Amino acid sequence: AYKIVTSQCTVCGACEFECPNAAISMKRGTYVIDATKCTECEGQFDKPQCVSVCPVDNTCVPA
């Protein structure tokens, strides 16, 4: 599963809508990834979609 580095997240929301597993949601003013839903997009995409769309490098990282 992946996680979002809260201190780097700009709360743009791009990742929430790109996640094919609906694993990303807003909690207490920032986005979080539900590890029980995150599959790292294996079998669906070449790399995790949160990583692909995030405008800030190294914000969506392996947990």
Curated annotation (Swiss-Prot):
Single Gene Ontology MF annotation: 4 iron, 4 sulfur cluster binding
Keyword annotations of the record: 4Fe-4S, Electron transport, Iron, Iron-sulfur, Metal-binding, Repeat, Transport
InterPro entries: 4Fe4S_Fe-S-bd, 4Fe4S_Fe_S_CS
4Fe-4S ferredoxin-type domain ranges (all copies): 2-29
UniProt remark on cofactor binding: Binds 2 [4Fe-4S] clusters.
Main function: Ferredoxins are iron-sulfur proteins that transfer electrons in a wide variety of metabolic reactions.
The keyword Chloroplast belongs to this UniProt entry's keyword annotation: no
Protein's gene: fer1
Cofactors: [4Fe-4S] cluster
Chain sites annotated for binding [4Fe-4S] cluster 2: 38, 41, 50, 54
Protein name: Ferredoxin-1
Short name of one Pfam family: Fer4_7
Keyword Repeat belongs to the record: yes
Ligand binding ([4Fe-4S] cluster 1): 9, 12, 15, 19
Lineage top rank: taxon: Bacteria
